[in-house]
Design a protein with these regions (language model features):
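Bacterial N-terminal signal peptides
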Residues: 15-27
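N-terminal secretory signal peptides that target proteins for export/translocation
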Residues: 1-12
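Subset-of-secretome marker
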Residues: 72-77, 87, 121, 126-132, ...
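Solvent-exposed coil/turn segments that connect beta secondary-structure elements
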Residues: 63, 85, 93-95, 105-108, ...
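Flexible, processing/modification-adjacent segments and terminal tails
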Residues: 34-44, 48-52, 107-177, 182, ...
Length: 291
């Protein structure tokens, strides 16, 4: 009888240990299966969290890294102007390049070295979309046009931290998706996957880092761009001014097009790139990426 009680006690003890182990493991992985807030509601909380500024003036440095990983990057000074919820202008000025990009109420134009570029939008310009478009419904519509289905949401982890994933079921990273900090609802990762017929190496990942609060508005002080896991460019913000006043002409696309002629076709641009040194080629490649 004593032996039976002893074995029963041992059995129950082992069963309890196994139960506790299973419970702990379940808790560790629960975030990926727990209840998830609806994507549109997450975007609403995100835009509310970023603040209520009416406009922003941002001074920053854009660093373009050489793809060979052996040479130092090219640094360019940029000035950004945000007028919420849907007007934006960036001015890139240096001895090598002069670039203006304007987005105003759904229309866009890019001027490079005094000439209007063939194309007015590209994915390197899109990083500002998450910071610009408000309210959440407007941002949801803009993300949808870029392949992010915000009606799909899940919980995941990135570098050990829990996060909301919009546009995919974690851990799937093959579709366009936006990641937000689970506690603050601030975005920190945007994966822009390439088209199915293109190589995955062409997918672009943008990371929003070092968020800082300016009065009642949050802004990332560092933004990184990765292709195939390689850092190809980064943005370092020096200053952010809240609610500055801007002339409406700065965002007048029709007015800008009247000031600058149409640039040469792409074929002519390729011909012009011959016999350039490495620094010039880097700048020309930068211009080409933004056309």
């Amino acid at each position: 009888m004593k032996y039976s009680r002893f074995f029963l006690h041992q059995y129950l003890k082992k069963s309890l240990v196994i139960f506790l182990i299973v419970a702990i493991v379940t808790c560790l992985y629960a975030p990926t299966n727990a209840y998830v807030l609806p994507g549109p509601y997450i975007l609403k909380l995100m835009t509310q969290n970023l603040g209520k500024a009416k406009s922003l003036l941002v001074s920053q440095t854009l660093v373009i890294h050489d793809d060979t990983l052996q040479k130092s990057g090219v640094e360019l000074s940029e000035t950004l102007r945000y007028v919420f919820p849907e007007m934006f202008r960036s001015d890139t000025l240096s001895e090598q390049v002069n670039r203006i990009h304007v987005l105003s109420k759904g229309k866009a134009v890019t001027v490079i070295d005094g000439k209007v570029a063939d194309e007015s939008d590209n994915r390197y310009d899109r990083y500002k979309n998450i910071l610009l478009f408000k309210p959440g419904k407007m941002l949801q519509d803009k993300l949808s046009l870029l392949g992010v289905d915000a009606t799909v949401s899940s919980l995941g982890r990135f570098q050990g931290k829990p996060a909301y994933v919009l546009g995919a079921q974690y851990p799937d990273e093959t579709t366009p998706q936006v990641w937000l900090d689970k506690d603050t609802f601030r975005p920190f990762r945007w994966i822009m996957t390439s088209k199915p017929e293109q190589s995955r190496e062409n997918s672009l990942e943008v990371r929003y880092l070092e968020w800082q609060k300016f009065r009642n508005t949050w802004y990332p002080m560092r933004i990184e761009f990765f292709m195939a896991g390689i850092l190809v460019r980064e943005i370092h913000v020096q200053n952010v001014k809240i609610n500055p006043s801007f002339s409406k002409k700065l965002f007048d696309i029709k007015h800008l097009k009247s000031l600058y002629p149409q640039g040469p076709p792409a074929e002519q641009e390729q011909e012009n790139k011959k016999d350039l040194n490495e620094v010039q080629k880097t700048i020309e490649d930068f211009k080409k990426l933004y056309e």
